[in-house]
Amino acid sequence: MTSAAAIPTVTLNDDNTMPVIGLGVGELSDAETEQAVTAALEAGYRLIDTAAAYGNEAAVGRAIAASGVPRDELFVTTKLATEDAGFQSSQDALRASLERLGLDYVDLYLIHWPVSQQGKHVDSWGGLMKSKEVGLTRSIGVANFHGHHLDDIISLSFFTPAVNQIELHPLLNQAELRAVNAEHGIATEAYGPLGVGNLLSHSAVNAIAEAHGRTPAQVLIRWSLQLGNIVIPRSSSPERIRSNIDVFGFELSEEQMSTLNGLDDGTRFRPDPETYSGS
């Protein structure tokens, strides 16, 4: 088990700190969510990532409340659903999320998808700025934003997101977008680091795992951490949750990193932000 104190943190561009690894709970049922968050907090996780669109914020809140972990030790992220896009509606949506979570504030609030064809991502960003100003969230950021989406909000608001959460794994290593994020001082947060499970049986990943006496999942998470990303693997299994955080006792070599970097072929397992208009 990894203690919470042993998990490194990164300082965001607003001077708030964020753990470099956390638990994602997308597509988990309420029961799975409560079990996963409970197991994660017991294992030393302090970053929990949910979203209004996941429908499980209340379950996250129940697990947090039952854990006994002090609020100031936690880092809770949730996200704005597309249907709530807009300046005022984004603020109202965060208040509703907080009520479901049973919290007075979140540590990070993200616009879940740009949905630029809807034309509201800039207005939503203004709403997030207001929510930060009044203390409903400590930090604000975006998810699934490409460079031009970032340019839209930064050029009009003169306020830069702290985080850009994107699909990122060896088949989609997002080198170009990571560089854009870095240029703006935006932390890159990787979701889907295991390729939604599709990379666990990849021969190159397994060879590296065998060389280190580690699991394929641990290798994939370690690869992303060594790239400088924040990583939020999703799991409902307490055993895998404990295993996924045990990634600070080994290091991939330059050759192994290069091997995994070389797998990039642009494969997405989640929607393309350029065309997606969902939640």
Swiss-Prot record:
UniProt keyword Oxidoreductase present: yes
Entry annotated with the keyword Methyltransferase: no
Active site: Y54 (proton donor)
Cited Pfam families: Aldo_ket_red (PF00248)
Key words of the record: NADP, Oxidoreductase
Record: residues binding NADPH: G192, L194, V196, I232, R234, S235, R240, S243, N244, R270
MF annotations from Gene Ontology: aldo-keto reductase (NADPH) activity
Enzyme Commission number: 1.1.1.-
UniProt-recorded name of the protein: Aldo-keto reductase Mflv_4205
Organism: Mycolicibacterium gilvum (strain PYR-GCK) (Mycobacterium gilvum (strain PYR-GCK))
Family annotation (PANTHER family): 2,5-DIKETO-D-GLUCONIC ACID REDUCTASE, NADP-DEPENDENT OXIDOREDUCTASE DOMAIN-CONTAINING PROTEIN
Family per record: Belongs to the aldo/keto reductase family.
InterPro entries (UniProt xref): AKR, Aldo/ket_reductase_CS, NADP_OxRdtase_dom, NADP_OxRdtase_dom_sf
